[in-house]
Amino acid sequence: MVYYEPGQDRNGAALRRSGHVRWFYIMSNVIDERFMAEALKEAEKSANFDEVPVGAVIVKDGKIIARGHNLREKSNDPTAHAEIVAIRKACKKLKSWRLEGCTIYVTIEPCSMCAGTLLWTRIQRIVYGANDIKGGALGSSYNLFEVKNINHKVEITRGVLENRCAALITSFFRSKR
């Protein structure tokens, strides 16, 4: 498992030597922000249905192949988290349970159920917006991916459009109090 903070590149030394560091930072941030903005649109759909506003999109080869938002209340399904909804759609589209070469963009740090499912799909990369200190399974609460016997390594990028993602979820829960 490899973690990246916003603005940190994935090809570090090679890019620094090539002199293209600044361009890569800008391009990777722009791309991540573009897809996170799409995940935020999905999260807003959840909020419109009085669901916890979490959204996700799965990207392969620069194209969105699946979208999802929370549907737990509407479907009476405790597993209908945004990530799981998007994973099911992506697997169906690819006709495979493996999501190798895919990236998921999700507005909040995945819980243990979603992180475990992402691990088993062999997804390449997870990008999330806001930390979830109560239930996040990628380091905020605990880290599911630090289990020693897991062979699959996932690239994780945190904090993309963090303020917008956090504001959406905070606003939702404030309105419930």
Question: What name fits each language-model region?
Answer:
Residues 76, 80, 84-117:
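Helix-adjacent hinge/juxtasegments
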